């Protein structure tokens, strides 16, 4: 397996011969060479140490001291280290910075190494590769977000172009999903899934056609071809899931199986012998979710604001969940609204049940508050990284399932989704909960190695070992009292550390007393520090051996108990995961009901029509912000439904001044539609939505300097995507198209875009503009409706009323807005003067005349001497018709162009 290094991590020069380095450094270099591209955490006692450039990288990233240890080819070896006890914090920061880490542990204690020979080095080996997509520890994960590893596999489709298969896994929750898409759909699909790490073949990684897309992803790992070998894919999947044939798994295409096998192979290799259980891959049908491209997701601020913050996003505004799993599920649904009308209705039924029965909703939410994150606790236990608190969490989860079932059983007629959740909650064994309850103590340590987690009385043999250990400690306390009396040193203490074991410690001023006769016959000097002197005695050594043996035996017995309980829990994994998912579903339904009640949302109607009728619509995020400020939100209606005798939805052309609320109105209608299709009530008094298959938004733009694109270029690229891809079932919102260039250029582009939306796309759309001349198009385009945002002038000032009404604005009030922004009075006065002169030219009348003169999609006529295409052009025309530009990569398009040129008649 090849892992792409984020930065160089190997020693600068070639590896030295064994004779030129210490045995420890020889071992380090061998392990490092076997794990290229990863920072090597090399265990040295209570620390993980890093060397060479790994140390320099870690020191810089973590802000820890860079020191040195020994020399390598005449130069000092850079070194830094982190305590094992705090390593999770450092690992989290390294992974967040884009690095990958190989954890190398000591596989034996130093005593065992000494028995093998005085020059033997402690055996070490890499036990795990930590990458962004393969995390399980709660300290490394965001509790409210999934952590997906995604594999991409590509193949040429029989109809031309490429097909892409995607397989994504969250090993912390066992989720495993596969799907296929076209090259043109890949960016939108990746934006929806939002993977933390993407694995691709070396060939795909080096493909220039994929370079731009891969650069946008947070972490991309290229792997060798064998990982993406379709010929061995089914065998590898069957091996991972321990099944004889693929019949036991979901039906998958050959390409999907290739991606799925790559994903599980990578998981297997990074976990090194600790194979995490996964759910069988679930196949996501094409078109089952609303397509939303990356630009639209960003513009609408669905899960993150444009500044990258969760606060201020739609997810933040609607998330009332009580559990981490519920929050993750809500984020998944928001990223992938459904197109299945029946499934949407089932979700709405569940929300409605909790909306109408507030007592049941509040009781369920109270129970859910105590429910642990069962999926992630189970995942940690399955790979040997769990602790006693994970076992207790699963025990508490089963008990919470009983309380939840008891409360839901009181519902008179629970809807289908709630009934399904109840069935899942019945699956875990109550006997398992009883066993865990009997085994675990009240106060549990975080780590199993700390011991003390088994309840007294659960295991008699353990109780005996603990008594012997604890009695020995009482002997130490009595010994300290006796030594204090014998020496007359009241500050004498018996202490313990991992280096010296048990020792007698006195302050420096009493050190000479214990080293002088007659006390020096009893007290043997061990260590002198700045303020203390340490001694041992033969009696203390004997007691230490007894305590160590008793303590080791007690801990060993406890670890056996833990491993036995963990194995039973992992065996019941499928039932526990089903219950965990049921908790998440109930949490989302109850939280959306709470949201609907608190914010006065209503149940939307979602059907198969092309209707779009919203009454009293509000922006879910802006309304809450205004409410916190003590201000009301002005609700507005929007109706894009086909008119009488029409078969396609309407386009609203929205005009009005800056700051009047046009962009808010556009966004709120898109968000209402999206919320309806995730199965949520919506901020409106009434809403009827004909199912939307694609959502497009071009609202706001900024320079993309990294890719050499101006604001206007970004705007045009996003607009091109919309005009090329929007279907009749799409909803499009466009704001200020054409504003980033010369006035007449921009007006012409906006004009042509409206015509295209009306005649070619035939979709439902909201189009905001300051080109008031475009309102005259409503006379030519029957499905174009003019709307404006109402304002009022009062004593020379403009008052924004935020009401959307039929009609067209005659002014943009730009100068008044500039005055409100604080432009100097002289600039405002001059602007008014210039505006008056420009308006006197009555440019608008010229444009209105063009509306009458230009037919739709008119193009300049051919020159009089231009002849019609010759008959031999027919093959070219047929070849052009066979092309599908949206499914072609740039390279494929170029090859097609050369092929067409070759078909031209020779002169």
UniProtKB/Swiss-Prot annotation:
Q: Which Gene3D superfamilies does this one have? A: 1.10.1420.10, 6.10.140.430, DNA repair protein MutS, domain I, MutS, connector domain, P-loop containing nucleotide triphosphate hydrolases
| Keyword Nucleotide-binding annotated | yes
SUPFAM superfamilies the record matches: DNA repair protein MutS, domain I, DNA repair protein MutS, domain II, DNA repair protein MutS, domain III, P-loop containing nucleoside triphosphate hydrolases
Q: Which UniProt keywords apply?
A: ATP-binding, DNA damage, DNA repair, DNA-binding, Nucleotide-binding
**MF terms (GO), sorted A to Z:** ATP binding; ATP-dependent DNA damage sensor activity; damaged DNA binding; mismatched DNA binding
Top-level lineage group: Bacteria
Q: Where are the transmembrane segments?
A: none
Signal peptide range: none
One Gene Ontology term, aspect cellular component: cytosol
Q: Which SMART domains match?
A: MUTSac, MUTSd
What is a biological process (GO) this protein takes part in?
mismatch repair
- Positions with a binding annotation for ATP: 656-663
Q: What is its biological role?
A: This protein is involved in the repair of mismatches in DNA. It is possible that it carries out the mismatch recognition step. This protein has a weak ATPase activity.
Question: What's the family?
Answer: Belongs to the DNA mismatch repair MutS family.
Protein name as it appears in the record: DNA mismatch repair protein MutS
What organism does the UniProt record list as the source? Nitrobacter hamburgensis (strain DSM 10229 / NCIMB 13809 / X14)
Per the UniProt record, the lineage of the source organism begins with:
Bacteria, Pseudomonadati, Pseudomonadota, Alphaproteobacteria, Hyphomicrobiales
Identify the gene encoding this protein. Answer: mutS
